[in-house]
Amino acid sequence: MSSKKHLEVQRWINKAKSDLRVARMAFNDSVPEYSLACYLSQQCAEKSLKALLIWLDVRFLYKHQLDYLVELLPPDYQRLFEEMDIEWLSDWVTEGRYPGDYPEATRDDAQKAINMAEKIFTLANEILVL
C-alpha cells in the first residue's frame, strides 16, 4: 500500500475511532444523550467502511447508507456484515440528529448502535491490519 493511501485510510480510521469514543461518552454521561450515541455510532461504522473501501481501491459516492457501502465490498467481505442490522444503524444518521417524527433513541437503541459500531470498526481494522 502506498504511503499516501495508508495515510488516507488511517485518517478515516482515526475519525471512526473518535466517533466511537464520543458515542460511548454520550451513552455513559450523567445525562445520557442516546440519540447522539446512535448518530455517532452510525458515523463510526460509515467511516470504518469507507476506510476499507479506500484500502480496496473501491470508488464510492459520499452517501451515508451503510448497506450501500457494504454492497460495494467484495462478496467475501460482504458476508462478514450479513448478520448485522445495517439498515437500522443507517437510519440514525438522520434520526439521531434532527427532530421529527422519529421516536427518541432509548438506552437499548444506543447500546445496540454502539455494539454494532464496535463490531464494524473491529472487523475493518482486522481486515486492514494497519
Please provide the spans of the model-predicted regions.
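Terminal alpha-helical segments
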Residues: M1-L130
